[in-house]
Each structure stands twice: as structure tokens, then as C-alpha cells.
């Protein structure tokens, strides 16, 4: 049949394809996904699982007039290939290339941007209601994985759909996985439906009947039979109780069946939910064998699936090993994750202390309140959540943890720039959104050993704590056998100096050392300080240097607005000191995806940029101001 994928410039190009051609296209897409993502890295497993589903959606519906909303949208690679971006697909997640998620500014076919779970149903309902008010006729289709239904936002939307619109299609992509295996009652409920042999036999028969008869008569007959069967096979279908007519489960890899089903659903004048069973990693044996690993990963060998490793432990691994040691010593230590045991490292904790390990699903708000409840009973919860995902639980952090001064520890992985995953996954706001909350202590380690010390310090602290640490590996410092408790709010002076005081926060402490060396070459002596604490800031240290240096330089892997540099300025102002503060950090904008080093250079987070900003202060007679 030739190279079908290269002939597709818009979804309209597949509408004349036969089913055998579409099946051949599906194989081409899988081959392209494997070969391309092997070079760029990305979410290979989820996308291999939705190839037929996405092809069928584009075959039946007409984007951009019809609207597709992908929950999380990490599974939108096939959609990108079918909507005119195949010739740029090799740039996926690369600097200046395609984003790894849906992005409204990237294509008119991307109706809604995403990167976090649970948003698709609410957004799709908003589009459907807007269409109804405007008198439009376009279709709105929300594609959400079964993991998204462990998120409370999805149920808030379900609670409103039937009351607010008559036409909305929800596609439940059920592969039984988020990143790890799905957990909780919803996962068990869906599994029960899928494994009900009588239900499966009924739907196979219904599909054959629909295909054989066709037309409205068949649709009505099948619907009446389904309703009768549902009453016999299970007394109360969850989605029907929310007012959505349920269809399924059906084979999410059967193109002919999917196309017929979508054509049928397209004619319905009521909210419907299609339950499609898919296989994560389908068509690539390494991804099938390692579904957790191949959810999302860096470059890999397209033949074997093998990935390279530096051998040096990541911050996530150091965190997990340290937590195991703390739990060995203290039977009140518990670990909580929101569907991220692999990403946070807690899959290492689980076998050591299974009774004190809790995966609550994609439910960050619940995770925080659950932790608060445990803390009231004398336990020490370590709540491991990516920085970007913890912002979803801001109110529980304030209302349930900090207001009650409960000893919950927030372990914020991916604090700082995350790189290839882009703005939905950068952890650039946590200092701003946490440091204004009373009672919380906020720590930032500069190396692996300091992370272990901070986790120990948090265990001893009788109040809320937060620890932010970056993605990937650190400088390679060995972790002590027994961690040390750090004095709360005290920085560590690494080098004394009387010209400039450099405060290098966390991962940017090595840059502080480089700036010190450059200043020394120019004849200036700079103090280098490891702040360690964002809150409380070491006021005594600031007062000491404010009377000695011509300027402070703060370095942070965080937005400048409300960040660590702002905290330093506020403390100096409270002390009545007018010493200038030069701040290096991220600007007031959403930072695109790309390589961390390249993005830092582009946005002036570099030795060169710091030296340029410091130039006016490299003399004792420089005017006092804040830059």
C-alpha cells in the first residue's frame, strides 16, 4: 500500500481509506512512534495503546470543527501525526520542536492544552455548553484514561454533564495503568466490568447486530437490548447514574468496530460514554513487558528497549533510600504518593514497608488531607509529589496542614526546570506558593547528602515541612550512614568574602562557585553561601553581610517573582538594610520545553549573565539600588 503516513497532511486525507488501509496505517504509525521516540524520548507506551482509537476518531469526526480534548494529552502523538505534523515529528520534545503534550498555539487541531490529569471532562463540557449557547452543531469528544477517573475533578465534571448539555462523547481509554498499576475502587469497578464474561459476550453480539442491520432501527434495538441487559448483568452502572449512557466495553484496537461505534455515537442526542479496552505499549514487546518503565522515558534502543544510565543515583532514588532508613528507625514514618511510585522513587520504599506505603491515585488534594489525618494520630507522613502537581493541592496545604500546624513533610520532586516535558511539568512556582503560608519550613538541598539530612530534620520537626529537589542526578556527594539534623533557618557559609555575597540555592550552588572564581580572577573576593532554607531565611547571616558587601547575588531555579531572591529582599528591608540584591532566576513567563542547559543560557541563568548584572557593584562606591 506504500507509505500511507507520508501522504497524510490533515485528517481529511484518511477519510477515503479502506479498513485494510487504516490497519496498515496503524502499523506504520507504531513503527514511526518507536523509531522516533527512541531518539527523542517521550511517552511511548500510552501512545502505542491509542493508535486505532485515535485513527477511528479522526476518521469519523472532523477536526478542527469538531473538538477533541485529551486528558493529560501525553497520549496525543498519534493525533499529532494525523494533523499535519508528521514531517516535524522527529523534533518532538526537542528545542524549538513539537511539544510532548497538546498545545493550542501549535495547531488548530489542538483544542485544549493539558499536561495534568483530570481536566478533559470539565474542559469538554465547557466547550459543549458554549456550543449549545451559540447554537453550534460540532461534536465534542473527551478522551480520558481510566487513571483520570481516580481524580476528583473528573467526578466533579461527571456530576454536571447530564444537567448541562445533551451532546457530549466521553471515551474512556481503559488500559488499567496510569504510570503504575491503577489503584482504588474505581479501578476495581472498571476491571469488574471488563472481566464480566456475559457482558463481553453481549457486546460482541450487539456489535455484530449493529453491523448487519445498520440504520436507526438497529441503534434503537441495540440500545433497548443493552438497557435490559444492564439491568440483568449489574444492578447499577456508575456512569448511567451520572446520566451518561454507557456503551462498552469494546475492543479499542478493532478499527472496524471503533468506526461503526463512533458513527453510532455521533448520532446520539444525549451524553454518552464509550468504554474502550486498550493495551498500553501494544506492538512493541519491550513496552509490553515493562509497561511502567515505558510509560515515559528518555532515548532507548528501538530493537531492545534498553536505556542508558549514568549509574549515579538520582535525587528520587536518594530520597527513597533515605526514607527507607528513616522508616526502619521510626515506625511512625509513612510514605504517600499520588499515582507516582516510580517517578518519585517510592516503588523502592514499598517492598520494605508495605503497610506504611500508600498510593492514593491521581488525587493530590486527597493525598494531602489524608496525610493531615494521619499526622493528627501521631504519624509522620512523607508526601512525595512533583512540584508542579503539588500546586493542585494548595488549599489543603493551607487549610488542612499548615493552619493546624501538622507535621506533614512535602517532598517535591522535579523542583526547578524539568526540561523536555515543558511548562506543564516545570516546577518553578513552589517557593512562591509555599513561602507565604505560616508555619511551614521550606528546605532546598544542594546535594544528595544534604537531601538526606533535610529528610531527617523534617522527621524531627514538629510542624509542616517542604523539601524541593531537582530532576535527575546531583553532584555525586556520598550520603552519610547517619544523617544530621540541620538547625532550622540556618545557612552554611562555604567561602568568606567582603565584596559580593553569593547565595546559590540548591542546584545552582555550583554556579555560585563558578561566579566566585570569575570574580577572583578580576580581583574581587566573594562569599559563597548555601542558603539551605527558603523559609525561614537566615536573617542573622543577611544582617552580617549587609554591612560588609556591596551587593548580594541570589541564584535560584525558580521564577523570580515571589521566589528566594524576593525573600532575601524582604528580609533586608525588614532589617532596614539597603544593600542591593541582584537576582538570577526565571522570568515572569511560562518556560518552553528544551534542554536545561540551553534554556538556562537563553534566559540569562549563567555565569556570564550574572557577571554582567554584577558589574555596577564591583566597586565600593557603587550607588545602592535593587536590580
UniProtKB/Swiss-Prot annotation:
One Pfam family of this chain: Transket_pyr
Annotated thiamine diphosphate binding sites: 74, 115-117, 147-148, 175, 284, 364
Cofactor(s) required, per the database record: Mg(2+); thiamine diphosphate
Molecular function as annotated in GO: 1-deoxy-D-xylulose-5-phosphate synthase activity; magnesium ion binding; thiamine pyrophosphate binding
SUPFAM superfamilies: Thiamin diphosphate-binding fold (THDP-binding) (SSF52518), TK C-terminal domain-like (SSF52922)
PROSITE patterns documented for this protein: TRANSKETOLASE_1 (PS00801), TRANSKETOLASE_2 (PS00802)
Binding, Mg(2+): 146, 175
Keywords: Isoprene biosynthesis, Magnesium, Metal-binding, Thiamine biosynthesis, Thiamine pyrophosphate, Transferase
Gene3D superfamilies reported for this sequence: 3.40.50.920, 3.40.50.970
Any Gene Ontology CC annotation: cytosol
InterPro entries according to UniProt: Dxylulose-5-P_synthase (IPR005477), THDP-binding (IPR029061), Transketo_C/PFOR_II (IPR009014), Transketolase-like_Pyr-bd (IPR005475), Transketolase_BS (IPR020826), Transketolase_C (IPR033248), Transketolase_CS (IPR049557)
Pathway stated in the Swiss-Prot or TrEMBL entry: Metabolic intermediate biosynthesis; 1-deoxy-D-xylulose 5-phosphate biosynthesis; 1-deoxy-D-xylulose 5-phosphate from D-glyceraldehyde 3-phosphate and pyruvate: step 1/1
Cofactor detail note: Binds 1 Mg(2+) ion per subunit. Binds 1 thiamine pyrophosphate per subunit.
Catalytic reactions of this protein: D-glyceraldehyde 3-phosphate + pyruvate + H(+) = 1-deoxy-D-xylulose 5-phosphate + CO2
Keyword check for Oxidoreductase: no
Protein purpose: Catalyzes the acyloin condensation reaction between C atoms 2 and 3 of pyruvate and glyceraldehyde 3-phosphate to yield 1-deoxy-D-xylulose-5-phosphate (DXP).
NCBIfam families from the UniProt entry: dxs, PRK05444.2-2
Family, as annotated: Belongs to the transketolase family. DXPS subfamily.
Name of protein: 1-deoxy-D-xylulose-5-phosphate synthase
Native source organism of the sequence: Acidobacterium capsulatum (strain ATCC 51196 / DSM 11244 / BCRC 80197 / JCM 7670 / NBRC 15755 / NCIMB 13165 / 161)
Lineage: Bacteria, Pseudomonadati, Acidobacteriota, Terriglobia, Terriglobales
